[in-house]
Amino acid sequence: EVIKTEAEWKEILTPSEFDIIREKGTEPAFTGEYWDTNTKGTYCCKACGFPLFNSDTKFKSGTGWPSFFREIAHNVSETTDKSNGWTRTEINCAQCDGHLGHVFNDGPKPTGLRYCVNSASLKLEAD
């Protein structure tokens, strides 16, 4: 588990990364670095480096955000998000609790899940 003060996070994250990862913001669709990337590798938490998703589970969802049908087992945690007037499932890094995005039940086989992730929350470690 990685625990830092908000001041420590502000020292290592850009203002936009801090807004998304620590304050649960959302980057505009089709603007993030990885929404249309096909590079093979492992997508890790931008804040702490914890591996979150493998590139072989990434798919084109048409939403404008990187989307994956499976996380690396036990590396992504889920919480209920009741903000904005509806209930969604928020996803966070299981190591530092950084906000990643949300998971939805409209993804492809084999899981039927769509992990919709902010590019600012990710760092791709290419193979």
Give the residues covered by each predicted segment.
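A short Gly-Trp-Pro
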Residues: E1-V2, E6, K10-D127
